[in-house]
């Protein structure tokens, strides 16, 4: 599978986020006493979000360059949601990581609000995979 490291990074980030956010949620019934598990969850969420921003910008820039240089029709859906740009196993793995991240975010958002930033991580990695390895259709040439 092409881009195995990208898929691996997506799942590792999602797993670390899930572990820390679920620990923060388990600790949340008494919100005004010791909030120890909240701090690692907050650090992980902010670190994943901060790391995802340059990745998303890279994916967008690389996709724009592919459009400009190769005359490929790189779309936002194809770039970030792998619509018709990735083989099914890759799409399943990367979008599965995004779905898992969204579920954890929904379950833990009340206890760990910084977690709502984390789904940008697997989404940015979808973009990086598509920008590097995705296949896009050619831009149709106008008839003369």
Summary of predicted features, one role per range:
Residues 73-100:
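Short membrane-interface loop/juxtamembrane segments of multi-pass integral membrane proteins
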């Amino acid at each position: 599978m092409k881009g195995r490291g990208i898929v691996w990074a997506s799942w590792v980030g999602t797993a670390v986020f899930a572990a820390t956010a679920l620990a923060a949620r388990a600790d949340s019934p008494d919100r005004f006493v010791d909030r120890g598990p909240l701090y690692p969850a907050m650090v992980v969420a902010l670190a994943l979000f901060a790391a995802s921003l340059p990745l998303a910008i890279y994916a967008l820039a690389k996709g724009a360059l592919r459009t400009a240089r190769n005359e490929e029709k790189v779309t936002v859906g194809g770039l970030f949601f792998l619509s018709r740009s990735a083989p099914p196993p890759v799409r399943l793995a990367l979008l599965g990581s995004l779905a898992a991240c969204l579920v954890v975010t929904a379950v833990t958002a009340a206890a760990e609000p910084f977690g709502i930033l984390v789904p940008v991580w697997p989404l940015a990695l979808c973009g990086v995979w598509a920008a590097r390895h995705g296949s896009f259709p050619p831009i149709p040439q106008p008839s003369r």
